[in-house]
Design a protein with these regions (language model features):
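Membrane-embedded alpha-helical segments of transport systems
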Residues: 51-59, 84-85, 92, 184-191
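Short hydrophobic/aromatic, small-residue-rich stretches within specific transmembrane helices
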Residues: 49-53, 181-185, 206-207, 211
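Transmembrane helix boundary and interhelical junction motifs in multipass membrane proteins
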Residues: 21-30, 155-165
Length: 259
């Protein structure tokens, strides 16, 4: 078996593990794994990523719902706004070349890593999951719409944005935000996938294999999320995202200059 295929499958399980543990993060790694490890063309990888992350998030959200850490009402508000944003964002993918698309990923990941590290430092030492305040409906709608646009455009579920938005605008504690984020990601991915389905040809066998491993990872991650401090996981993952961002930007910067 090809060593890159083995590595890609291992990383697929880690993608699911991250989604289950911190309610995001794994989705932003899916496209780079598909492109640079499994050899999928960049535009096709965006659609495949939506399918993989959507199925994985649905499995994780179901487990969180059974544990009482998934708020359906809040998820539906974010999700409804996100669906509209994802449908509008999907056609924008074709406006960028593969190298430009990867540069956009790298830039977004760099911002995400910084935000995750800053949020970790602000919340460190507080594991409270008591809601802070009531749901701010219109702020939630605007935040959901913005995340949806990113989902459709770049093929990311947006959990790294949804979790802090749910804490700030949805009044949820960290663990509840993680569970709720997974269902919002699922809704956004379905909407984004509709926009990409008619534009791309997916390798169904590879998509199914990656999905099975990612779902397995998210089941394990969800079970572990109630035992491990999310702040510690978040800081480690932020460093990983930062390293991947530097790799993507370095690899594609020269290509764009020579275009």
């Amino acid at each position: 078996m090809n060593i890159f295929l083995i590595l890609g499958l291992v990383l697929s399980a880690l993608i699911g593990l991250s989604l289950g543990l911190i309610g995001g993060g794994g989705s932003i790694i899916t496209v780079p794994v598909l492109v640079y490890v499994l050899g999928v063309e960049a535009h096709d990888a965006v659609g495949m990523s939506l399918a993989v992350v959507g199925a994985t998030s649905l499995a994780g959200s179901f487990l969180h719902y059974r544990r009482g850490t998934m708020h359906l009402k809040t998820a539906l508000i974010f999700g409804a706004a996100g669906i509209i944003g994802a449908l509008l964002g999907s056609p924008l993918t074709k406006l960028l070349s593969p190298s430009a698309l990867m540069m956009a990923f790298g830039t977004l990941m760099l911002v995400v890593a910084i935000l995750m590290l800053r949020r970790k430092s602000r919340t460190e030492g507080s594991d409270s999951d008591v809601p802070k305040e009531g749901l701010s409906f219109w702020k939630a709608v605007l935040a959901g719409f913005g995340v949806g646009v990113l989902t459709g455009f770049l093929g990311v579920g947006g959990g790294f944005l949804i979790v802090p938005a749910l804490v700030m605008f949805g009044g949820l504690g960290m663990k509840d935000a993680i569970g709720t984020s997974l269902f919002v990601i699922f809704l956004n991915c379905i909407a984004g996938l509709v926009g990409h389905a008619s534009q791309n040809q997916f390798d169904r066998n590879l998509t199914a294999l990656v999905t099975v491993l990612a779902v397995s990872g998210t089941i394990v991650g969800t079970l572990l999320s109630h035992r491990i401090a999310a702040a510690k996981l978040q800081s480690s993952f932020a460093v990983f995202v930062l390293l991947v961002a530097v790799f993507l930007m370095t690899k594609n910067y020269g290509v764009l200059l020579g275009a």
